[in-house]
C-alpha cells in the first residue's frame, strides 16, 4: 500500500522487439497475478507477478508474425493472442500449451477481447466487421457490421451488454450484444481510435486517438461527457481502474498518465519509457499499473489505493 505513484519494477529486454500489447489478470481465489505480453518478435510471454517482481513463466511460440493483441480470460486460465499472421491462438496458462489456432483471415485480426463470461472472443477486422468466435468451438459464431473502415480497437462492457469498436477513421460504434443491433455511432475523433475502455459500472466509455485527445462518453445516451488533453502525441491505449474513479493512458509521447474521472484531470505522469508506450493495464484491485512499449520493456507502477 502506498500513498504515491512510483515505478516499482522494470523488466528490460522483455522481448526482442517492440511490445504492443499487455494484459493483467488477478486470480483472487489463488492469489495469482498473471501478466501476458505480445510482441513483434512473434512471441507471447506469460509472467507471474510475485514478491514485487515479474518472473517469466512461459514463452509461447506459434505465431508466424508479430503479436498485436493479447487478452486473458476473466473466468478461465486461458490467454488469447492475435497476430499479423491472421491467426488467433488460445493458450492454456496452466501448462503453457497452445489449445487452439483460429484462422481469422482473410487479412488480419487486430485487437481481440474476451467477453466478460469468457464464452466468446471478439476481434476487429480490416473490413469494418467485428467477428465473434466461440472460445469452446474455436469457430466464428456471428459478426457485427459497422459498415465502416478498418477496426483498430474493441472492448466489451463489464456487464456484458455492449461491445464498442473504434475505427481507423475515428468513428466509434456501440452495439447491443443481445440483439446484435448498432446502438450508437460516435464521431468525436477525426483520427484512428487506438483503444477504448468501459468503466467497471459500464456507464462510461473512454476512447484514445491519434488526434492526441481522450474522450469520455456516457454510454446510455451517447453524450460526450469530457475531452481530455495532455499527451503530446498519439494516445495509444487506455484502461480503466477497477475502482471506477481513475483510468490510465499511454502514448507515443513515451508517457503513461493517470486520470481522475470525476475532475477529468491528469493526476500523475510517468516518464520512464524510452519510446512509444503501446499498452497499459491495471491489476485486479487497482494497486498496480503495467505498461509496455517499443523500448522492449515492461514497467510496473505502484498506485495509491
From Swiss-Prot:
Q: Which CDD domains match?
A: WD40
The family database entries (InterPro entries) matched by this protein are listed as:
G-protein_beta_WD-40_rep (IPR020472), SKI8 (IPR051510), WD40/YVTN_repeat-like_dom_sf (IPR015943), WD40_repeat_CS (IPR019775), WD40_repeat_dom_sf (IPR036322), WD40_rpt (IPR001680)
Q: Name the SUPFAM superfamilies on file.
A: WD40 repeat-like
Assigned protein family: Belongs to the SKI8 family.
Q: Give residue ranges of the WD repeats.
A: 14-57, 62-101, 104-143, 146-187, 188-227, 230-269, 272-305
N-acetylmethionine: residues bearing it = 1
- Which BP terms does GO give this entry? negative regulation of myeloid cell differentiation; nuclear-transcribed mRNA catabolic process, 3'-5' exonucleolytic nonsense-mediated decay; rescue of stalled ribosome; transcription elongation by RNA polymerase II; Wnt signaling pathway
What are the GO cellular component annotations? Cdc73/Paf1 complex; cytoplasm; euchromatin; nucleus; Ski complex
Subunit composition and interactions: Component of the PAF1 complex, which consists of CDC73, PAF1, LEO1, CTR9, RTF1 and SKIC8. The PAF1 complex interacts with PHF5A. Within the PAF1 complex interacts directly with PHF5A. Component of the SKI complex which consists of SKIC2, SKIC3 and SKIC8.
Query: Which keywords accompany this UniProt record?
Result: Acetylation, Cytoplasm, Nucleus, Repeat, Transcription, Transcription regulation, WD repeat, Wnt signaling pathway
What's one Pfam family here?
A: WD40
Which SMART domains does the UniProt record give? WD40
* Residues that bear N-acetylthreonine: 2
Question: What the protein does?
Answer: Component of the PAF1 complex (PAF1C) which has multiple functions during transcription by RNA polymerase II and is implicated in regulation of development and maintenance of embryonic stem cell pluripotency. PAF1C associates with RNA polymerase II through interaction with POLR2A CTD non-phosphorylated and 'Ser-2'- and 'Ser-5'-phosphorylated forms and is involved in transcriptional elongation, acting both independently and synergistically with TCEA1 and in cooperation with the DSIF complex and HTATSF1. PAF1C is required for transcription of Hox and Wnt target genes.
Q: This chain belongs to which protein, by name? A: Superkiller complex protein 8
Q: Where in the cell is it found?
A: Nucleus; Cytoplasm
Amino acid at each position: 500500500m502506498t500513498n504515491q505513484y512510483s515505478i516499482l519494477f522494470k523488466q528490460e529486454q522483455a522481448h526482442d522487439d517492440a511490445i504492443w500489447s499487455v494484459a493483467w489478470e488477478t486470480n483472487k481465489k489463488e492469489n495469482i497475478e498473471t501478466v501476458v505480453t505480445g510482441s513483434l518478435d512473434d512471441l507471447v510471454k506469460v509472467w507471474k507477478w510475485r514478491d514485487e517482481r515479474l518472473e517469466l513463466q512461459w514463452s509461447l511460440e506459434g505465431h508466424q508474425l508479430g503479436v498485436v493483441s493479447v487478452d486473458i480470460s476473466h473466468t478461465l486460465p486461458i490467454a488469447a493472442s492475435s497476430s499479423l499472421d491472421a491467426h488467433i491462438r488460445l493458450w492454456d496458462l496452466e501448462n503453457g500449451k497452445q489449445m487452439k489456432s483460429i484462422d481469422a483471415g482473410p487479412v488480419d485480426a487486430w485487437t481481440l477481447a474476451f467477453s466478460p463470461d469468457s464464452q466468446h472472443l471478439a476481434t476487429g477486422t480490416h473490413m469494418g466487421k467485428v467477428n465473434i468466435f466461440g472460445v469452446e468451438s474455436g469457430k466464428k459464431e456471428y459478426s457485427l457490421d459497422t459498415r465502416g473502415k478498418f477496426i483498430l480497437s474493441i472492448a466489451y462492457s463489464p456487464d456484458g451488454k455492449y461491445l464498442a469498436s473504434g475505427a481507423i477513421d475515428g468513428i466509434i460504434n456501440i452495439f447491443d450484444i443481445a440483439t446484435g443491433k448498432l446502438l450508437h455511432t460516435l464521431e468525436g475523433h477525426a483520427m484512428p481510435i487506438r483503444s477504448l475502455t468501459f468503466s467497471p459500472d459500464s456507464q462510461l466509455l473512454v476512447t484514445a486517438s491519434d488526434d492526441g485527445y481522450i474522450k469520455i462518453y456516457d454510454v446510455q445516451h451517447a453524450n460526450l461527457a469530457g475531452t481530455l488533453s495532455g499527451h503530446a502525441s498519439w494516445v495509444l491505449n487506455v484502461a480503466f481502474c477497477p475502482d471506477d474513479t481513475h483510468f490510465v493512458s499511454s502514448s507515443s509521447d513515451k508517457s503513461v498518465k493517470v486520470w481522475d474521472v470525476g475532475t477529468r484531470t491528469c493526476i500523475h505522469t510517468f516518464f520512464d519509457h524510452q519510446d512509444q508506450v503501446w499498452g497499459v493495464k491495471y491489476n485486479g484491485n487497482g494497486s498496480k499499473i503495467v505498461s509496455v512499449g517499443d523500448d522492449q520493456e515492461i514497467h510496473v507502477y505502484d498506485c495509491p489505493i
